[in-house]
Amino acid sequence: MARSLKTVITNFSAGELNPLLATRTDTPAYINGAKQCRNFSLLAEGGVMRRPGTTYLASLPGESRLIPFVFSDDEIAIIALSNNRMDVYNISGTALSSNVTTNCNWTTAQLFELNFAQFGDTIFVAHRDNPTRKIFRSSATTFEVQEFEFGTDDSVSVGGVDKSQQPFFKYAAGTISVSLSANTTGTGRTLTASANAFTSDYVNQYIEVNGKQGFITGYTSPTVVTITILEDMGSTGPHFDWKEQTISSVNGFPQAVSFHNNRLWLGGVKNRPASVLASRISEYFNFDVGSGAADEAIDLDISGSEVNEVRHFLSVKDLQIFTDGGEYYVPRATDNTITPANVAVLRQTPYGISRTAPLLFDQASGFVQKNGKSIREFVYSDIEDGYKSTAVSILAEHLIDSPKQIAVLKGNATRPEQYAFFLNNGTTSPGTLAIFHSVRDEKIAGWGLWTTRTNDLFQSIISLNEHLVVCVKRQLNGSTVYTLEKFADTDSITLDMKLTTTLNQKGTPLVQGAGQSGASVTIDGFSTAPVINESFTIAGNATEYLIQAVTSNGGTSFTLNLDKSLAATPADNAAVTLTKGFLHNVNTIYRNEQVNCVDGNSSLGAFTVSGTDTITLTTPRATGVHIGFNFIPILETMPIDKELAEGPLTGLPRRISRAIIDLNSTLDLTIKAADKTAKSLVVQQVTFTGGSDLNPVTAKKEFFFLGYDKSPTVTLSQDDPLPMKVLGMSVEVVFAWVLIQLH
């Protein structure tokens, strides 16, 4: 005897769930989750929407790392760093500064290890193997890369060398001393170490002896260098109190950089990995610790049983410090200051961060754990009176694959949702975007995955205010091309790498001969024959004519029969302009590729671009047809299960007999049950007046299925690149009552 029951899926706010949760029917996430949630945006109301497509902006010179430049709401720019090069674009894809190579010291391998901090018109770029750089906007449309240099004190100067305001550190063993040929200021002094301490790389670097500075001008041997003494060093020694530049080509450079509490913070110097350095207040190039006054520079190392490499800073209410071995923060005094006297670094959690920079998202700092398999949020807890690092990806860890970049979108002009995007770079799903939707105050959190065309990969991602921009690695016309693309604000753009066509005018058609009248006209100058159902206008009259028959006169001349008589007698050689046609011009970047075409609410199908950069549509269309690449959204429910008084349905054959899908503004939908014999059903609103566009469906649509399955699911997808929103569904399940009793 068969029985049936109904269950309602009111929302999908938990997103895609780990396959290992397939039998966890007891959890709230199971009820509101999905077996697959691919290429959908989770909505604040609980439904899902086909993810927005992208618009093609520009082609990049190679593999690139995008970084945002945001000066204000109106002044933003996309900075693309590639191998020893920088290019800058506005949000429309227009180049502002191109092929900048001066001072671009990063390599392709280092791109996603670079860290950034912006202050006004300047972005500081840090890497442990490279001297720090500054990207400076010198005018509204001009960007350049400059060397980062510590400040100097020209009141102390000898031989053209000024005293430096940089930090110093004793790297050499404490048993090594130095002696001087003379301790007074002057050039050509000899400094001798008691053991090997120098290489030729030390030339043109500062040294500090007894707290007084000198400048190395020559190298003689591992124990002997020539220096210029800038300040009297007290005696000729030997001196055990001597230091080198903290930051140099010898000892490496900082990899963490941030602005906090009106100071520039540097950290994680390669040979001093636990270092935390802060400039003087409001003097961002002055790292002179001086006497330790409240406004002077800060120089310390994070202490612990292990040396923790400082990888990232994040300036929020506190300065958060992320290392490879744990998470720390620098508390503020009651007067909100951080000074050399009160500075402290407090360890909070022990997980460690990858080289991917953290970002603030939904009141917490999201970061990729060092193992690359977990996303955690570093958030303050009043109950614990400290920070905790909660794993937010635990229900969907299969979607996390060593992310190399994070971007946060805090809503846009049309939707309130905020999303965090994690660009995967592992071996399982490289080039995909794990997307996290969270509303902390409502205890809503869910994951999904975004992909693009098969064999194409997302390469870099940033947000600029409400804009989301990506670099995509695409295979186009047999070559690898890196494209700059911008996600749309809504699902109205349903294609990736979208551009619009222009109607091919088929040469330079002109009216052939004066005095023509009636419902036909002879036109010369066609490079391609006109086709029935194409439309055109003639100069001097706005009337649009539809071609109903075509007669070739030989060469480029054709006589066209029209749907109406000529409104006026056209002049000889009057220009003819096609207004609707089959042949359309496209950007050369699509050459020999198969593209999908969408016009308004109608999907026109897939077409292959010719070697001359044209497509031939099956219906005549005006200029402005959207072309691009389709992507497939998939929403599959968790196995429909139920706990009955007689026992659970888990593992028993059952059939989804009916599903009612709540749709909103949907133009295309395919639906099937999990059974192998189930067929895709299509809903598309086709009740429209000839010549008009399709009408989106906002309604509850009912579907019926056959076939039994032990883990039945409902899968929603699309064949055509058109808008789709699913708010929820009601499912009816039929099962054998006798099996429940036997079970």
Where do the protein language model's features map onto the residues?
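Beta-strand-rich solenoidal segments
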Residues: D87-K170, Q213, I229, F422-L423, ...
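Short beta-strand elements that form the blades of beta-propeller/WD-repeat-like
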Residues: I76-L81, I123-A126, L264-G267, R311-T323, ...
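N-terminal beta-propeller domains
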Residues: M1-L96, K134-G186, H239-L314, D318, ...
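Structural signature of eukaryotic scaffold interfaces centered on beta-propeller domains
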Residues: G62-D73, Q110-F119, I247-N261, S305-V316, ...
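Catalytic or ion-translocation cores adjacent to nucleophile or general acid/base/metal-coordination motifs
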Residues: D335-G372
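Beta-sheet repeat architectures centered on beta-propellers
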Residues: A2-I91, N308, K373, E377-G513, ...
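Autoprocessing Asn-cyclization modules and mimics
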Residues: A95-V100, V145-D241, S389-L399, N477-Q594, ...
